[in-house]
Amino acid sequence: MGYVLQQIALFPNMTVGENISLIPEMKKMDKKKIKETVDRLLKSVDLDPKDYKNRLPEDLSGGEKQRIGILRAIAASPKVLLMDEPFSALDPISKTSLQDLIKKIHDDFKITTVFVTHDMDEALKLADRICVMKDGKVIQIASPTEIINNPENNFVSEFFDNEKRINDEQFS
């Protein structure tokens, strides 16, 4: 399983390339394949490997650091990616860009993603299934459209009340 945390947690003394290749190296993947994977992943998020592979995290913007954290999480091709509020500390422009990136990664790499968020707009945008919990108990699991149109109870209805203005096409 790959994971991306709210705090990016790149190793400051390691280059971008070293950060991304860390897990594949720990799994004893072929060195040539690791290099190819790092380059391919950087290109997939519009970061030129020649420009970024040897940079240190201190030389990156917050959004770039988060992209590298995501790439590190998927570099060893996990079947499941856990993302725990990864964009909560980012500015709106970076957040939107990274949300779009997550959708692209999900589609391109076919990785099941468990995305933890308190941002209902984010849940509606990114999820094909949403699990609403209260006090550690599951209240409803459904598609975004089903959650909006048929909330299980008042808690779910109120939780998503502001989202009712969103057109179904935006989150389907």
What do these predicted ranges mean?
Residues 32-51:
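Conserved ABC ATPase "signature" region
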Residues 77:
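Conserved catalytic motifs of ABC-family nucleotide-binding domains
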Residues 81-84:
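Catalytic Walker B motif of ABC-type/P-loop ATPase nucleotide-binding domains
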Residues 141-142, 150:
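ABC ATPase "signature
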